[in-house]
Amino acid sequence: MFKWIANLLKPVPDKIEEQLLSNFDFLLNNYNFIYCKVKLGNAVDKNGKFFFYGPLNAYQFYNENVCINILHLVQRDDYNVYITDQKSVNQVYIRNGTEISSELAYNFSLFAEEVKQAVLKHSEWNGYKF
């Protein structure tokens, strides 16, 4: 296959994805985290009831101990961040994880720096081992 055709078929990262990958690159490079973006459809609440029409994207950084789930409700440009024990595409499971303050959810660089400093000093953040 021609290289330019292969490049056309590759997914193009969105602006949010680029910011996240830039800010959280230390997790990928130093702590063997894996990154993925998942489209979750319509948003549901902690009880599984309809909350808002999608699209709802989950940007996830995870390893065998922890998953940082950054949920983005695209139409409203709202963010919520939840920490769970493992990666999942189940919104109820994600939303029942540890919720991170909106101050950090809307400021990726501050969020990444807080995680980085905690991990460097204690090898954990919010009770989750890295």
Model-found features: residue ranges?
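Intrinsically disordered, low-complexity regulatory regions enriched in serine/threonine/proline
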Residues: 2-26, 31-130
